[in-house]
Amino acid sequence: CTHQQINNCYFTEVGNEDWGCLAIAAGYVSDINIEHNEISEVPYSGISLGWGWTQTVNCMRNNRVHANLIHHYAKHMYDVAGIYTLGSQPKSYVTENCVHSIYKPGYVHDPNHWFYLYTDEGSSFITVRDNWTEGEKYLQNANGPGNVWENNGPKVDSVIRERAGLEAGYKDLLNIQ
């Protein structure tokens, strides 16, 4: 997929029957823009961007995850993050998102293996900047070159937290039952 937009959507209570589902999963993509979404009450991670556990440059590039609000995630699974990346993605950005309130189910195999932001194997050439998280629990696992991590955590300007999620014209989605 190329040049796709996932903007101003509300994802909640997805994956109730298949706990391995994500709210947004974008595998081998380029020029995708995922912004101003709200994700809550999901069994696993909120957003997964990329695929292929390799540092080899491929079709994935120019991707953007921006100003999303992700909360109350990982209801049933661990090895998770609010935002998770995998594989080489030159000129890709994870910026100005707000991630908080992870569930802590007692039956997961490793109760400490959860993160707010997680760049997994082969994640390369990705900038992770200005994301508000309620703590500084991140994982950079077997990453490749060129990643930039700047100004993430609870000390990020509160304006970023307030602007994340649905834009004003889409807030009525929160009232749909």
State the predicted function of each range:
Residues 15-22, 43-49, 58, 70, ...:
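Short glycine/acidic-rich loop motifs that flank beta-strands on beta-rich extracellular proteins
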Residues 54-56:
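Short, small-residue-enriched loops and turns at beta-alpha junctions
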Residues 82-85, 90:
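N-terminal short leaders/motifs
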Residues 96, 107-177:
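Extracellular beta-rich repeat passengers
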